[in-house]
């Protein structure tokens, strides 16, 4: 199997470590790094491993050229056996993730992953019972499917319109944390709840303050 790492930032480097550990062949592409800006025919690769910071339009173009585009979350969901708790929201997700991580480490063991912590691929099966993952709208938008055990949705305000295009698409990316769940949690704000929350089949646990 041959892979192309598309984007060589923090996540791209974690892809590199993951593939090296698996002893798999790969190339790296990053338009902003001269060492890695060689153009490739994407069709020749078995899989394209995309970083979350790739612009939405470019990501859609990549998927048209190769139908096996994966994110680090897709691989983590497949390979890791810990109980996975995802946290997203416009504000306070880092704070929430940090305090949950501290709490879980008092009574058990926990990874702190995502934007606030380590790359998810660096923590696959490292003997921690829980993985607390801070998730951005970029990550949620690009992941294939939601394999979290629990999802926590905090507040949603207008943000990242340069990536998503409009507020509705931004909300849809956040909605993905609530799909395919046994249990979810969200911040109770009577002025900003969305109709789609009431349609979720998962168990809903409401709260007003952290």
Regions found by a protein language model. Give the residues of each.
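Short glycine/serine/threonine-rich phosphate/pyrophosphate-binding segments
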Residues: 12-15, 93-99, 119, 135
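Conserved substrate/cofactor phosphate-moiety recognition/catalytic segment
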Residues: 29-36, 105, 109-127
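Short loop/edge segments at beta-strand edges and connector loops
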Residues: 30, 35, 71-73, 113-117, ...
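Residue-level preference for the first positions of well-ordered beta-strands
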Residues: 2, 84, 109, 130-132
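Flexible active-site lid/hinge loop adjacent to a nucleotide/diphosphate
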Residues: 127-210
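Conserved Rossmann-like nucleotide-cofactor binding loop
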Residues: 11, 34, 118, 138, ...
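Short, basic phosphate-binding NTP loop
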Residues: 1-86, 208
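Walker A (P-loop) phosphate-binding motif
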Residues: 72-116
């Amino acid at each position: 199997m041959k892979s192309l790492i598309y984007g060589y930032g923090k996540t791209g480097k974690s892809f590199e470590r993951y593939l090296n550990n698996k002893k798999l062949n790969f190339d790296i592409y990053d338009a902003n790094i001269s060492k890695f800006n060689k153009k490739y025919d994407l069709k020749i690769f078995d899989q394209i491993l995309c970083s979350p910071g790739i612009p939405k339009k470019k990501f859609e173009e990549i998927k048209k050229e190769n139908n096996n585009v994966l994110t680090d979350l897709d691989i983590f969901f497949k390979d890791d056996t810990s109980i996975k708790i995802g946290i997203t929201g416009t504000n306070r997700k880092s704070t929430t993730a940090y305090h949950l991580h501290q709490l879980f480490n008092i009574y058990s063991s926990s990874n702190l992953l995502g934007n606030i912590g380590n790359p998810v691929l660096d923590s696959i099966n490292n003997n921690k019972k829980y993985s607390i993952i801070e998730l951005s709208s970029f990550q949620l938008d690009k992941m294939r499917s939601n394999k979290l055990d629990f999802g926590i949705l905090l507040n949603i305000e207008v943000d990242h319109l340069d990536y998503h295009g409009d507020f509705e698409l931004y909300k849809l990316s956040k909605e993905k944390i609530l799909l395919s769940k046994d249990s979810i949690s969200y911040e109770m704000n009577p002025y900003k709840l969305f109709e789609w929350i009431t349609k979720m089949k998962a168990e809903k646990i409401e709260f007003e303050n952290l």
